[in-house]
Regions:
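Acidic, glycine-rich loop-and-strand cores that form catalytic or ligand-binding grooves
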Residues: 116-151
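N-terminal leader/linker segments that precede catalytic domains of diphosphate-processing enzymes
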Residues: 1-54, 58-104, 108-113, 130, ...
């Protein structure tokens, strides 16, 4: 009976409901005959990550795909229309600490005039994509540890409070520019894109 009922079943993901899905657009413009990456500096009034450098993006809503979310967020934050965005390709999905999954998309902006939503963005700027292909970021390692809640039943676990939980490691990258420090998940996405650009475009 199990074979009949589950034989064609496809594997899902445990605790899928706990995964926070987000999407970002990595915007490119043509400037001086080469590709530039457009960045946002988050508004100082925001509750999360004020003043940090990032890409336009946000949470994936229940009724949309990550690609649709990336486009929607870019339109809202950069005050541009859908026809100004040409999605070039999906980039590699990033699994971040805290059960977050970020789907980045590379996109070309047509006729971007440095507009942005003042409620979310302080200002925008661009950096040549080639610069990231020619400069490796600084890398620092962080350690991820398990901290059980106060009511955790240690008496039911071998070793009790001395139980040896597994520890994880997470690399954090930094690009230092005169415009500011590009770090964290933004830098990790950039590093991956820069490697693709260097190997698939510049060195071909």
């Amino acid at each position: 009976q199990m074979s009949r009922v589950w034989g064609s079943r496809r594997a899902g993901r445990l605790e899928k409901e706990k995964i926070r899905r987000a999407a970002v657009l990595v915007p490119l413009i043509q400037k001086g005959g080469e590709y530039h990456v457009v960045f946002e500096v988050r508004a100082g009034s925001l509750k999360t990550q004020p003043g940090e450098i990032c890409f336009p993006g946000g949470a994936v809503e229940r009724d949309e795909t990550p690609k649709q979310a990336a486009i929607r967020e870019a339109m809202e934050e950069l005050l541009i229309s859908r026809r100004q965005i040409r999605v070039i390709a999906p980039l590699d999905v990033l699994e971040a600490p805290g059960a977050m999954e970020i789907s980045p998309f590379l996109g070309a902006l047509q006729g971007y005039r440095w507009s942005y939503s003042e409620a979310e963005v302080d200002h925008t700027f661009s950096v040549p994509l080639r610069w990231f292909a020619e400069h490796e970021p600084e890398r620092y390692e962080t350690e991820l540890v398990t901290v059980p809640e106060e009511t955790f039943p240690f008496e039911d676990v071998p070793g009790g409070r001395d139980y040896r939980w597994r520890r994880g490691h997470y690399d954090v990258y930094f690009y230092r520019r005169e415009e500011g420090i590009i770090w964290g998940m933004t830098a990790k996405i950039l590093r991956s894109l820069a490697e693709m650009y260097r190997e698939d475009i510049l060195l071909k």
